[in-house]
From Swiss-Prot:
Organism: Drosophila melanogaster (Fruit fly)
Protein name: Cytochrome b5-related protein
InterPro entries per the UniProt record, alphabetical: Cyt_B5-like_heme/steroid-bd (IPR001199), Cyt_B5-like_heme/steroid_sf (IPR036400), Cyt_B5_heme-BS (IPR018506), Cytochrome_b5-related (IPR053100), FA_desaturase_dom (IPR005804), Fatty_acid_desaturase (IPR012171)
Binding site for heme: H59, H82
GO biological process: one example: lipid metabolic process
Assigned keywords, A-Z: Heme, Iron, Metal-binding
């Protein structure tokens, strides 16, 4: 099959099937991946086919990760989510055969390569670093959850615009900090992510299994789900000249409605296709209920709902303002269509798709609430953000050895770069690591 030139992926031998779907969702991405990956209805790691059916309920990280990845290639996800060597040894007994077809993904995870070298050094470093910042992360998360409810009640009770804005920011930050938790084994903190009308289970697919593994590529749901309103791929076949400039106008509207769109899309898809809703999609309703009860029921249900919707809209805008200007969109970093570096190591690919927020590193609170330390988070997503600063020495050492470069900027610079990327349609001909 001949692939049209503009559909050729820099990290795979085929164009992802899910991008042909009329409505792009986590379910359509999973369905397409099962068609594309050559996993033969089971689980694929490198060139082996594994049957983890009997292991689903035994998985220490929870059954979700195994159940939802059945029928797909989990090579990179398996590597990034397991820091110890025990899982690699354990899976041998679940192998049933070699794969019939070669992998479609062209990124590598070779012994002695960048990622495996860094991973070994990080494994050693973790034996001696201070673990107390992890407890601080837990306290920050708990404090934000409590404050969003208290401020939400105060905003309604005293009709305070200031309290409303503060409650909205607290909701936004709660959602972002909760993202620190859904990459890991099941825990109560991950449920707080749903307070913003999004869903941690859906984001475990769209964010952890799609965006984290294939950032800024055709396989990245966090690119495709915003199209055509916002399009960062430098490709005129995907973004028209009109949409390049209209996106600057639609952007603030998309920001304010993003949380509602996520919920609405899941409801629509569940009614028309396959159910992708969970019981914990009801958790956002605890906010207007808390406001109603906290004001003694004196304000009426409609006022409480109105206050909640206003909180959610402001939080949605804030979330997008932070999240879409946090790490991934700038003309200087790799997007699908740009030239690839010669070394196809998956870890280096992660570094090439990220520009970190250098202005956040002095504060654990800001790192947690603004997607900071992003390169290390992509490379080791199961580690608490509070532990990441201690890993910079080995990261810099390994980057130097493999000709990698950690890019940094502040928030304003990133916002400017992100808008330049929305306009860019010409691929970057110079590969990362190629020198001047």
């Amino acid at each position: 099959m001949v692939i049209e030139e503009w559909k050729k992926s820099g990290i795979a031998t085929k164009f992802p099937t899910y991008r042909n779907s009329a409505l792009i969702t986590t379910h359509s991405w999973q369905k397409g991946k099962r068609q594309d990956d050559g996993a033969e209805g089971l689980w694929r790691i490198n060139d082996g086919i594994y049957d983890f059916t009997s292991f689903i309920d035994k998985h220490p990280g929870g059954p979700f990760w195994i159940r939802e990845t059945k029928g797909t290639d989990i090579t990179e996800a398996f590597e990034a989510h397991h820091l110890t060597t025990a899982p690699e040894k354990m899976i041998a007994k679940y192998k049933v055969r070699d794969a019939a077809e070669p992998r479609i993904y062209t990124l590598t995870l070779e012994e002695g390569g960048f990622y495996k070298t860094l991973k070994e050094r990080v494994r050693e470093q973790l034996k001696t670093i201070d673990k107390r910042p992890k407890k601080k992360s837990d306290l920050i998360h708990l404090g934000l959850v409590v404050s969003l409810y208290l401020l939400g009640i105060a905003s309604a009770k005293y009709n305070s615009l200031l309290a409303l804005v503060l409650a909205s920011v607290a909701l936004c930050w709660t959602v972002i900090v909760s993202h620190n938790y859904f990459h890991r084994r099941d825990n109560w903190q991950m449920y707080a992510f749903n307070l913003g009308m999004m869903n941690f289970a859906a984001w475990r697919v769209s964010h952890a299994l799609s965006h984290h593994i294939y950032p800024n590529s055709y396989f990245d749901l966090e690119l495709s789900m915003f199209e055509p309103l916002l399009c960062w791929v430098p490709n005129p076949h995907i973004k028209s000249k009109l949409m390049r400039y209209v996106s600057w106008v639609t952007e603030p509207v998309a920001y304010a409605l993003a949380f509602f769109i996520q919920m609405g899309t899941r409801i629509f898809y569940s009614l028309r296709h396959t159910n992708i809703l969970y019981w914990h999609d009801l958790l956002p309703l605890t906010i207007p209920i808390a406001i109603y009860l906290g004001t003694g029921g004196s304000l009426g249900i409609w006022i409480c709902v109105r206050q909640w919707l206003a909180m959610t809209s402001i939080a949605s805008f804030s979330f997008c303002l932070i999240g879409l200007n946090a790490a991934h969109h700038d003309p200087e970093i790799y997007h699908e269509g740009d030239a690839n570096r010669e070394d196809r190591d998956w870890g280096l690919f992660q570094v090439d798709t990220i520009i970190d927020r250098g202005d956040l590193k002095w504060s654990q609170f800001l790192v947690l609430t603004h997607f900071g330390d992003h390169v290390l988070h992509h490379l080791f997503p199961t580690l608490d953000h509070g532990l990441l600063p201690a890993l910079y020495p080995v990261l810099y050492q390994t980057l130097d050895e493999f000709k990698g470069h950690l890019r940094e900027c502040n928030h304003i610079e990133h916002m400017i770069g992100q808008h330049k990327q929305l306009l860019r349609i010409e691929p970057n001909p110079r590969a990362p690591g190629a020198g001047k």
